[in-house]
């Protein structure tokens, strides 16, 4: 541990990073600089990161002393847990170590605490042969009967509509490619999150703006078959747009256009009334700024920092933007998270979105049920729906597939291919009347002669 602390101290002093702000910067720096390939050393660096987060208010020598003391307490608990032949997750060991400091536990009291935690931990574990899938399905499905069918305003952002309740839960478990109301929450890092002017400029750059939004006057001249538009300099300033950028966009889109300061005069390709009206619509709807797939943008102040909420989502594009906090910025589009950040991030998004959807309706579901659903949806390395086009339609058992939906199709295809069902699952054994490999049926009795 002293070696790791020394490396972190050296790295932070060379790069001017004050402990512990932020921990991720110098931990990532060490991992890159030292090319750490030893898994134990990686675990040690992650542990150090968590310890630093818990001692965020300290700096320099005080921080290093606190880190060393906590690490020694964790080692003490680890040794005791090992002697008891218990298997605790790292977080639980760290919580026991924190209890030693908080309550000043003696060795005997620590021994008693570990014994009690072991009993509670083993009691909380799932029994072998338990039908966890059935319990999870019931635990998530039953509260769904109490959920609303309506689309509400997003909590705290009245200007944005976001799908909530049962429709949102269905979107999540169906793994819809196109969700009804995609939205992003964009956070900023450093001092920029407190800079309203900076955030508003970013918001105006993201927000979809059309030429119609910056016009003072607009008219169709039937006499000389032209469309005339006058730009409003005040509106252009309010939206933090550049006059030259607007003109460049207009000249690129329309071939027949005359520009006289703020007056724009357009001519249709053919001198007909129909073409003139089509041209007028095209002029008004010309997009002069914004990001693909993003419409309305709302800026809100949350806990002293400025946050952008959007209608529509383009996470990959926003991550390329300077000043955006890539750790906290997120979207409710699970497939986009999978594309940009990977399958583990998509799994976490499924858990977070499902849990939040339930909690917004005042419903509480044990997160382990939701985690099991998310694990099944992402087990193959891509996000799959729970239905005939996903998990249920891709089961190894012919009878299990046929029992869900499209029975005839599955039986016909299996017959053509000559598939064999080895009857290893639950549903197929229920269908043919055999004991199921679950609970008491998961063990066999051997009679000695």
From Swiss-Prot:
Question: Which biological process terms from the Gene Ontology are attached to this UniProt entry?
Answer: DNA-templated transcription
Please provide the record's keywords in A-Z order: Cytoplasm, DNA-binding, DNA-directed RNA polymerase, Nucleotidyltransferase, Transcription, Transferase
Unknown: annotated span: 1-68
Q: Where is this region: DNA-directed RNA polymerase subunit Rpo1C?
A: 69-449
Q: What is the lineage of its organism?
A: Archaea, Methanobacteriati, Methanobacteriota, Methanomada group, Methanobacteria
A molecular function (GO) held by this record is:
DNA binding
Q: Does the keyword Cell membrane apply?
A: no
| Protein known as | DNA-directed RNA polymerase subunit Rpo1C
- The organism named in the record is Methanothermobacter thermautotrophicus (strain Winter)
Which domain of life, per UniProt? Answer: Archaea
Q: Which NCBIfam families match?
A: RNA_pol_rpoA2 (TIGR02389)
